[in-house]
Amino acid sequence: MRRRSLSTAAGLSLLLALPLVPGIANACSRVFSNANGKAMVVGRTMDLFIDDRAALALRPRALAGGGLLGLKDANALHWRSRYGSTGVLSLGAVISDGINERGLNANLLYLGTSRYPDRNTAIPGLSNAKLAEYVLDNFATVEEAIAGLERVQVVSDRVLNRDWGLHLSLADPSGASAVVEFVDGSMKVKRGNDSLVMTNEPGLNWQLNNRRRYKPFGGTLPLPGDIDPPSRFVRASAYLSTLPKAASADDAEANLYGVMKNVAVPAGARDYSTGDSEDTWMTLWTTIANLSQGHYGIQLNSDPDPVWVTLKHLHWNGSGMRVLPLRGIGRTGDVSELLNGAPLQTKTAPTGAV
């Protein structure tokens, strides 16, 4: 992501949206702009009621990866990364968003209605919290990633001493897109135009059916303005559908950032649609990933100055994961070299204490 595109968008303004307090709704949004004519661009907001301590991570090739976090399993999946990747490390333990050197993008969002299969230890087990890490480490395209997920058993792992429902979105430079959800113990995949937008519960099929009630999609209702997942899904879908063709890759990034601002949750905002008046899940950060040109940018809600990395400038050969904390970074612009020289992570945060 380059400075011109970010300034054009007035500057870039969810680890897992973790529902630690019963009754509090969650929020995260992902949008893929793949028809703008200039670049394949993915935007994502992370909304959480606690600080996820977002850091940029650089995962080199041949890095050891493990399939489970808080569970003990005799057949947990293990691997060494085939591709280098960069993304957001949340709570010191989970890659919640990122892009690899081949341009595959992955976003991990909360979905409370997820239902995973009963564990079958004859099949290698993969934590749902490791989904983004696994696909970015090992696959170059959306279809490769889906095929890889079909060979393992994804299970609900424990983070912060409890189980979380999660779903995964995927995109690659060809324009391919997919959403992976776990419904009644089975993995379900939605591809194509129906997978360009993802928020939270209810699941994607419900969201697509609900969207038809609104004027941009043949219904009678005006666009909803609340912060609940269905309202954000409809707004994001509508604004994505009306984006003009981009004049440049910079314009494609800036235009998508405008969509993301319309689904971001301001500090103190409350959800008046679901009755969750306690809802204060503000947007912590927003990412814009240009899959065509290999740029990955992030802006913290607490810092008006965005930073980004350029994939071709990152060092993909190394001995461990490098971690660059973002809060108080005191920099703006391209931080590729800063990330290349960032400290190695020597210990993963305990999943019960992050």
Outline where the language-model segments fall:
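N-terminal export leaders
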Residues: 3-16
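Sec/Tat signal peptide C-region and signal peptidase I cleavage site
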Residues: 21-27
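A contiguous strand-loop segment
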Residues: 27-123, 156, 325, 335-340
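C-terminus-biased signal that marks the final domain/tail of proteins
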Residues: 27-41, 49, 55, 62, ...
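Short acidic-glycine loop/turn motifs at beta-strand connectors
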Residues: 34-37, 100-102, 172-175, 181-186, ...
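Structural recognition of the beta-strand scaffold that forms the well-ordered cores
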Residues: 41-43, 105-108, 169-171, 179, ...
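Proteins synthesized as precursors that undergo proteolytic processing into mature forms
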Residues: 120-158, 162, 251-259, 267
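Catalytic cofactor-binding cores of redox enzymes
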Residues: 151-187
